[in-house]
Amino acid sequence: MNQWMDLAERVLDGAEVTNQEALAILNCPDEDLLLLMHAAFHIRKRFYGKKVKLNMIMNAKSGLCPENCGYCSQSSISKAPIESYRMVDKHILLKGAKRAHDLNIGTYCIVASGRGPSNREVDQVVDAVKEIKETYGLKICACLGLLKPEQAERLKQAGVDRYNHNINTSQRNHSNITTSHTYDDRVNTVETAKQSGMSPCSGVIVGMKETKQDVIDMANSLKALDADSIPVNFLHAIDGTPLEGVSELHPVYCLKVLALFRFINPSKEIRISGGREVNLRSLQPLGLYAANSIFVGDYLTTAGQQETEDHQMLHDLGFEVESVEEMKAGLQSACNTEV
């Protein structure tokens, strides 16, 4: 048994990955990459088999954000030429939900730019979510920014299953990325969502000049937060943002990062998110030996690959898409457990 499979077995037996072991994963010799990914898949298979969860983003409100996040094309300091608009009408949200349902995508993610939602924007999302649930039964994830407890309660009661608010980077690196809100603001929103009964979703953006130790700290912070779903983004540096020109990550390093997140958060949904196509490139399929979830279609202000290419990739891998009906059954089981 090689060192990575030995570590995987210990993780499955309940052991936690030490900092030294985590650094070893990120520093894994390239010639041992397939051994590492095989061990990551050994963990993934225990909890998810060969299933892959599909997610689709609806950019419900674009631009117009007062925050100064250095990676974001929608921020107040960005000069990127993006489309800006206020919260879209309900029929647009319903149209997106129908498309997700028709493509057998189980999770529909409603994302709005800004520091946090106004009560009117929460009203709009609540109104749409009720109809989406009744008509299509999709799993709904909302990502609306910093959240107040009463807003979280309303979203939960309307049928929002999951709330996303990423920590983005390590606490140590946070002030290098933004100064308009704190790391604790982000953590508190995840906790607020969790306290309302929504499933907490929080992830990271790798490639923002952080160290390997920062990446390890991110994975451990999400373990401490007990995030059910962890989107791992790889920076897609956009012209007009402060991080424009930052070099793309090497695909092999991206795979090691995904393996690290699987080892540290063995039972969680690990989703390969923004920047998948430009950073992993031809090695995208290997990422799913560690991750068990992807976004299908476009991201917020950058294009993803065609849905047909994603489905072909999954078919070629021999993986199975979690259908909308399977997702519904899982939600019902979770509801019964809560009762």
Swiss-Prot record:
Binds 1 [4Fe-4S] cluster. The cluster is coordinated with 3 cysteines and an exchangeable S-adenosyl-L-methionine. Binds 1 [2Fe-2S] cluster. The cluster is coordinated with 3 cysteines and 1 arginine. Residues 47-276 form the Radical SAM core domain. Pathway: Cofactor biosynthesis; biotin biosynthesis; biotin from 7,8-diaminononanoate: step 2/2. Keywords: 2Fe-2S, 4Fe-4S, Biotin biosynthesis, Iron, Iron-sulfur, Metal-binding, S-adenosyl-L-methionine, Transferase. It comes from the Bacteria. SUPFAM superfamilies: Radical SAM enzymes (SSF102114). InterPro entries: Aldolase_TIM, BATS_dom, Biotin_synth/BioAB, Biotin_synthase, Elp3/MiaA/NifB-like_rSAM, rSAM. [2Fe-2S] cluster binds at C109, C141, C201, R271. GO terms for biological process: biotin biosynthetic process. HAMAP family: BioB (MF_01694). This is Biotin synthase. It comes from Bacillus velezensis (strain DSM 23117 / BGSC 10A6 / LMG 26770 / FZB42).
